[in-house]
Structures are given as structure tokens and as C-alpha cells.
Amino acid sequence: MTKTLIIAEKPSVALDISRALGGFTREGDFFENEKYVLSSSVGHLLTLIAPNDPVKGKWSFAHLPVVPPEFDLAPTKDKRSVDRLKMLVKLIKRKDVSALINACDAGREGELIFRYIAQYAGQKKPTQRLWLQSMTQDAIREAFATLRADDTMKPLEAAARSRAEADWLVGINGTRAMTAFNSKDGGFFKTPVGRVQTPTLALVFAREEKIRHFVPRDYWEVKASFVAAAGIYEGRWIDPNFKKVADDAEQKESRVWTEAAAKSVVAACRNQPGVVSEESKPRFEAAKPLFDLTSLQREANGRFGFSAKTTLSLAQSLYERHKALTYPRTDSKFLPEDYLNTVRETIAGLAEGKGMSKGIAPHAATITKNGWVKPNRRIFDNKKVSDHFAIIPTMQVPTELSDAEAKVYDIVVKRFLAIFFPPVEWRDTVRTTLVQGHSFKTEGKAVSYTHLTLPTIYSV
């Protein structure tokens, strides 16, 4: 009887799969039952190399560009990775293994990790793809019931290989070219170039240049207190004829650029009566979109000071270890259109108030009671979901999290619930007080109507 080899990206994922499918016995670094052999990589095990690089060590323009006709693979230098690669190759070549399942992370890098291993093993056994959006046992079993055909993954494989090879070409040629340029007058000044690091460094450099060339300018603002029958209110002088200046962001309607001009406004208006006009407009504020990875990282940085790397690590832990969030490495802020029932069940679970959902349970219950989960293009849109959908909580509510994990889980859950509430209706009011030909603006806003939505959810 032949078996299928499942290769996950991390040992922890392999362990979760073994628990979800059941019946496995552990044999060192792999698991086995009557149907499957199950093991994992430990991240990237192989790296690209150019065969017989003829100009290694001769970094001059005469030997550029370096474009190999093909790329070879070489094991990384880490001993643990080398040992794991040997084991996986041995498992792939087992005579009783007739097929493979790629269970690496559902994304470009996960695809590349598996493809490199299979290529290095020199085997072309039939392959299927396990595509996990959540790490709960039910989600794992459901994903095994809907394995993807290998042909459907070819575009993702091509994208992954192209990215890796482009990185190599840009890095090798760019680094050698810039090093040769900076060393042309003698010496050796290695200048690394990379697809990501170089444009990122350019952003930092541009910002630093802007700071260094900034010329401070003094400006004045005139503020006034007005006495009315209902009480005292403040206004700020503005130029009613102001127009934005395209190349000078410091020009604003309330700024006066000479002290004399500011004092003349004060002298003209002090203790003088004013004529008031007022305009009010309704404004509807919907909840912010669901999180993708980038927006989650920005929110966590702004609220908690977490770095992008820290937030990703926490979200990955909530996904893999706690099974509390869906796949975090996503660039979509939308959910599939067939996800309505899953969302309803998830919100119903949060409404029970168990574990980490205790504080927000009443809000989840309000959504369920009012039937607010329904088709909505702001939330459910297949056209805006690619490989993965937005980051949302799963039906597995955690009971114990670290302080940092709890913070990330909390903002994801609140963003998830808030989007199902109706918009808040605000009334924005602009009051203009005209005194001796000078205009003073007073702005205010008040909630006209709300379903106890954004303010109360985010204050829990």
C-alpha cells in the first residue's frame, strides 16, 4: 500500500495536522499512519546559486551583467536545516511514497520552500496543495477535503521563483556595479544593493534630506473668545480667500506671516461686536475596513509601539499556536462572499463571553440579535480576495494570551465587530463670526445617531 507524504513549513504545523487527522505515530522528526507520512521543513532549506560563476571576486563593470543560463540550488549552511533537508529527501524517495501534499504556508514563500525541496530531491511525484486559512482542527480537516490541484498552483510557483531569481540578479549585479563604481579611485568599498533594502534606504535618505534642508519660518495665529447668550466660545482667524499653494504645505488659512499683521487684526477686533453665520451638515462614519497585515502593523505600531516584525510574530503566534486568528500574511481587507455563515458563527461564539471575548460579548450579541451580518460589498467581495482574505478571529476563542498577544487579538476582534454595526451619524457645524471685516472660524461636531458602535466597542 502506497502513502502520501505531507510536507509542512514548520514542525508546529505538522503537529497540528497530525492531531487534526489523527492516528499518527511519531518517528523522530516525522509522523506516520496507514495513509500518510507527515513531516516539515524548518523554513527555507535551500538557496539559489549560479553554476560556475566565472567572475567571482572580480567586481568590475567589464564582467557585468551576471545572468546565469539557469540557477542551481544549494543547502543553507545551518546544520539543523541540512539535517532536515536530508530527512525530507529520504522520505520523498521512499518507494512506498507515491504522492506529495504541499502543506507549507499558504502563500508565495511557502510555495517556494516546497518546490525547492521537491526539485532538490529530483522527484516528480503527483502533488496536491493544502491551502490553510485557519489552524483550527475543523479548518485543517476541511482543507484536506478540498485539496487544490497542482496545475492551479503553477502561477504562484512562477511568481515565487521569479521573485527569488530577480532578487538574486538585482543583488549580485547591483552590488557588484555599485561596489565597482565606489571603488574606481582605489580601495574596495562594498556597497550592498537589494530589491527591498535599496528603495527603503532611499526613502530614509529623502526624508533626512528634507529635514536637513528645512528652513523654519515664524508665523502667528489669532484666536478670539466670543461672549454669546449660550456662553463663551472660541474662534480662530482665517483668510476666507485662502487657496492652497501646491509647493508650500506650510501655507494655511489660519496662519499670519508677520507679527504686525497679526497685531493689526487684534487691534481691529478687540471688544467689537460680531455677526454670526452657521452651517451644519450631517456626516456618516462607517467603521474602518477589516485588517490586512500592513494595516494591522500600522495600527499596532500607533497604539502600542510594536514594530512591524513584532506584530507579524504576534499575529503568527495567534494563528499557529492559539488558532485564534486567520492567516496573517494577507494583503486583502475583504472576506469571501460564501463566508457569511462562518462569520455569523464566529460572532455568536464571541457573544458567549468566554475567554478573551468577555468584554466585547454584548456588542457581538447586538450584531447577532439585529441580524446585521448580511451581504455587503464593503466586507464580502470575491473580486478583492486573492489567495487570502482579511485577518479576522476564528471560532476558537483563546483563554490565555500574553499581554502583547492579547493587545493584537483585541484590536482585530474589535475591528471585526465594528464593521457590522451601522454607521455613526455626526453633525458637523462650522460657525463663522465676522468682526470688522475679519472672519473667525469655530468648528464642532456631535453624534446625531449611533447604535452604540465605534465609541463603545473601542472603549471596552
How does the language model describe each region?
Residues F306-W372:
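Extended, well-ordered alpha-helical scaffold/bundle regions in very large, multi-domain proteins
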Residues M1-I172, W372-V373:
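Intrinsically disordered, low-complexity regulatory segments
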Residues V13, E109-I113, A158, S162, ...:
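Hydrophobic (often cysteine-bearing) scaffold residues that line and stabilize catalytic clefts
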Residues L21, T25, Y120-K125, R148, ...:
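A generic secondary-structure signal for well-formed alpha-helical elements
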Residues I140-Y219:
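C-terminal or mid-to-C-terminal helical accessory/interaction module adjacent to the motor/catalytic core
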